[in-house]
C-alpha cells in the first residue's frame, strides 16, 4: 500500500513458509535455493531490480548478486551475519538481544510474535497472517519423521562472500548491532546503515523509511 503503483514487486517465500508449498529439503543447501530464485527471475524476465531481504535471506542475496548482475541495489533488514549465525552466545551475548530472547521465552514465541503483528497490522490483515501461519504449522506437523523444513546452511556458505562496490547497500538494523555490520560481509564503500527499532522485524516498524529508499532508487 505504501509503494506507488508504478513499482512492481515480487515476493518469494522460503520453502515451507508463507504461501510456498510443503517440501522435504533434506539434502538441499543454500546454493540450491539461490539457483531456484535465479530461475524464477530468469523465467519472469526480471531485470533492473532492487533486492529487499530480511534475516537469513541476506546471505542468499549476496550469493544471488554474484550470479545475476541485474540487481541495482540491496535493501537488507537485519541480514544474518556469519558472526551471529555461528556465535557462542553463552560467552559473549549482546545484552540487548538477550533481553529480547528473555521476552520470547517469557511469553512464548507465538504470543511474542502476535503482539508484534497486532501492533503493526489492521485486524483483518493480522487475522489473515495468523490463519496462514496456523495452516502451515498444521501441514508441517503431519510430515514424516526426518522431514527437513529448511535448507542446510554451513560456515562454508559465508566464505568468500562479498558485494561489489557498484551496488548500493542499505542495512536497517537496531543500534546495538552497528559494529557487527560494519565488520560484516555486507560492508562495502557503498554501504549505508540506518539505525532504529527495538526488534528483529524492522520491515514493519521502519517500513516508511524503507519505502523512501526504494522510491529514491
Language-model-detected regions and their locations in the chain:
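Active-site loop/turn elements of alpha/beta-hydrolase fold enzymes
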Residues: 14-16, 79, 174
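Flexible "cap/lid" loop of the alpha/beta hydrolase fold
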Residues: 74-107
Amino acid at each position: 500500500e505504501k509503494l506507488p503503483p508504478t513499482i512492481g514487486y515480487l515476493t518469494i517465500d522460503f520453502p515451507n513458509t508463507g504461501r510456498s508449498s510443503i517440501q522435504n529439503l533434506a539434502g538441499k543447501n543454500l546454493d540450491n535455493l539461490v539457483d531456484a530464485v535465479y530461475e524464477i527471475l530468469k523465467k519472469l524476465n526480471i531485470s533492473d531490480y532492487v533486492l529487499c531481504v530480511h534475516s537469513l535471506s541476506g546471505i542468499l542475496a549476496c550469493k544471488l548478486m554474484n550470479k545475476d548482475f541485474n540487481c541495482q541495489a540491496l535493501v537488507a533488514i537485519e541480514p544474518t551475519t556469519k558472526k551471529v549465525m555461528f556465535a557462542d552466545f553463552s560467552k559473549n551475548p549482546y545484552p540487548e538481544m538477550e533481553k529480547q530472547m528473555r521476552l520470547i521465552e517469557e511469553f512464548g514465541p507465538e504470543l511474542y510474535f502476535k503482539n508484534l503483528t497486532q501492533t503493526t497490522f489492521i485486524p483483518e490483515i493480522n487475522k489473515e497472517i495468523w490463519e496462514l501461519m496456523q495452516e502451515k504449522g498444521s501441514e508441517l506437523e503431519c510430515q514424516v519423521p526426518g522431514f527437513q523444513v529448511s535448507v542446510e546452511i554451513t560456515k562454508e556458505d559465508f566464505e568468500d562472500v562479498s558485494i561489489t562496490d557498484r551496488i548500493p547497500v542499505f542495512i536497517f538494523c537496531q543500534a546495538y548491532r552497528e559494529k557487527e555490520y560494519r565488520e560484516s560481509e555486507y560492508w562495502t564503500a557503498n554501504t549505508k546503515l540506518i539505525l532504529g527499532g527495538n526488534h528483529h522485524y524492522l520491515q514493519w516498524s521502519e517500513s516508511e523509511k524503507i519505502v523512501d529508499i526504494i522510491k529514491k532508487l
